[in-house]
């Protein structure tokens, strides 16, 4: 089966596994962008860790969950966000101020909206988690 949006598939797999109380989930096919998003979620404490498994068909990401994900998802289409527009998008996707993360792709790499604001740069919205 062809996957059209691996980020959306991966984020929905995380949410579904968290809702059913699973401790780990396997996401396939893997991508570098999804791996970078998982690294940000791991740094924030939403997941315990993840590992890449090569299977000859695009690879898999095995994610170890902590049970802290209430909701996560991909943002489609990927909106371009400037620094002064960040608060508007926070209100759209996050339930409260200083609660949750939006993940952005910037010219300095993939990072959370908090880090992007600290560095004074904008980017494209990829997803959110809280």
UniProtKB/Swiss-Prot annotation:
Keyword Heme belongs to the record: no
Domain of life per record: Archaea
GO MF annotation list: rRNA binding; structural constituent of ribosome
GO CC terms: ribonucleoprotein complex; ribosome
Keyword terms, alphabetized: Ribonucleoprotein, Ribosomal protein, RNA-binding, rRNA-binding
One example of a Gene Ontology biological process annotation: translation
Binding partners and assembly: Part of the 30S ribosomal subunit.
Protein task: One of the primary rRNA binding proteins, it binds directly to 16S rRNA central domain where it helps coordinate assembly of the platform of the 30S subunit.
PANTHER family per record: 40S RIBOSOMAL PROTEIN S15A
Protein name, UniProt field: Small ribosomal subunit protein uS8
Organism whose genome encodes this protein: Methanoregula boonei (strain DSM 21154 / JCM 14090 / 6A8)
